[in-house]
């Protein structure tokens, strides 16, 4: 747990080092990935993703964005407006962690982040990429459905889509936009939105781990 004194907010996190961490130096920095949990799911519920990133040389920081003292996630449409408060709080948390951890882990590059998020954590990731586009290189989301994917030629996006719920209007790119921006949208047949974490069926976890 790390504390943001300015907001009097405790932030549950889990940091895992890459398997090749001995090669990471201040001169040759290794990449960083933030893992943003879905609403109501523990930040420790995405070890398949942490492991995949660690094996590829990333430092991973898994983050819980909801505390018991926070307001409940708004159930009223339009979500792009009503949930912005929640997502923006998540963006402030990520920005705080970037500033706080970059000095503690000088052998890792906090200037070109990879943001990974499931559901509401994916919405937070997409908003962060929209607000701080120069600090993000890659966004990976698991079936986020509310916040628009950044249309930015410098941010690579992979979004894996569940098959049980549609995304809101304009969240995903249309065919002409897909030709312009480095975005990949993949539907995983028979996958369910709420299964896209460690507790989902093994075939799905294996598929997402790739």
What are these regions (language model features)?
Residues 157-161:
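Short beta-strand/loop motif that positions the catalytic acidic residue
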Residues 35-40, 119, 162-163:
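Glycine-rich His-Gly loop
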Residues 99-153:
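Primarily recognizes the serine-hydrolase "nucleophile elbow" in alpha/beta-hydrolase
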Residues 166-172:
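Conserved alpha/beta-hydrolase "acid-adjacent" motif
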Residues 3-108:
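Serine-hydrolase catalytic machinery in alpha/beta-hydrolase-like enzymes
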Residues 162-166, 190-192:
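Acidic beta-to-alpha connecting loop that harbors the catalytic carboxylate
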Residues 183-210:
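C-terminal catalytic histidine-bearing segment of alpha/beta-hydrolase fold enzymes
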Residues 29-32, 56-59, 110-112, 134-138, ...:
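Loop/turn elements at helix/coil->beta-strand transitions in domains of secreted/extracellular proteins
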